[in-house]
Amino acid sequence: LSSAASDVYKRQDATDPGINLFRFDVEKGTAVPVKSLSGIQDPSYLTVSRDGKFVYSVSETAVPDAKVCAYSFDKQTGTFSLLNEQHTDGSAPCYIWVDSKHRMAVTANYNGGSISVFSISADGALLPAEVYAYEGGRPGAERQAVPHLHCVYASPDENYLYANDLGTDRIYKYEIVASDKGLSLREGTPASFSLPVGEGPRHTVFHPNGKWAYLISELSGRVALMYYDKGNLTPVRFVEADTLHVSGSADIHITPDGRFLYASNRLKGDGIAIFSIDLENGQLTKIGYQLTGIHPRNFVITPNGKFLLCACRDSHIVQVYEIDKQSGLLKDTGKDIRVSKPVCLKFTDM
């Protein structure tokens, strides 16, 4: 097979939470279970190193239990081996990013109002965390009284790191500094970017051309087109993804050819908003809406752009949709992958 899915799921309220590995045929849209890894409490998000040799998963719990687990991954056998664990010292880590050469890992700690920065040793193990805590919020505001960090990600050239704060409507910016000791963060100039009050920034994705970034805001249900230039992100237009205004927008991804963007919504009218992208200026045009199973918290697009896999947490399935290459619309293949409480999906070659 040209690619296999390291489709990973948090089974949040299941009897045996953990990570499931499937071999996914990216031409036929079918999945075969390979291995499962149990015993991780609330593994709500993970990332795979670019070379596919390491997996890093958060355990979205409260301090002092909140942590990151580092695993080596054997592509031949599909075996995970625990390297080590490190505490985040920030409650509810819900997102993790690792640089392309796996020298640094960073988590967004939702209830901790912080990010945790870990250096990674040559064998893939994590060193203790350095915590960056934030302040602010609107007293009395529902879900925005205090900082709630929800996502960390890098610029395409990995010169900058950004942290989305749902609680304060800010995107924090850092320079990623390389030295003989590894990578470190330095406060950017400016240190942050402000968004309209009540946006609630959640996840961000860069366009393949590296010039545009798209932000899905959980509370407003809008997608922001942001122009990227020398480390700065400038919002230029907002479009609605959630027309029901229930403050449950979740995930966002772009097809490999850069022509279509998808954004998921939860809580009511669960589904995925579909947009075409103007390749001249990055502007979005809404072209459709695909209803999904219940609570589509996370989804991925296959590396060849043929399928979209959607983790429907409360339907206990991963739905497999075929992407129409011309229109961008989705067609349910009916080839559901059944798993308890799926919430995070990742691909890696095997």
Segments the model singles out, each with a brief description of its role:
Residues R23-G29, Y71-G78, F118-L127, E175-S184, ...:
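Short loop/turn segments immediately following beta-strands, especially the blade-tip
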Residues T15, I40-D51, D89-H102, E135-E158, ...:
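Beta-rich, blade/repeat-based domains predominating
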Residues V32-S38, S81-Q86, E130, G136-E142, ...:
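A short beta-strand motif characteristic of beta-propeller blades
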Residues Y160-E218:
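Loop-centered beta-sheet repeat module
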Residues R11-A14, T61-P64, N111-S114, T168-D169, ...:
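Short glycine/acidic-enriched loop and turn motifs that connect beta-strands
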Residues P33-V98, H102:
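Blade-loop segments of beta-propeller domains
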Residues L1-A5, Y9:
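Single conserved hydrophobic/aromatic residue that forms the stacking wall/gate
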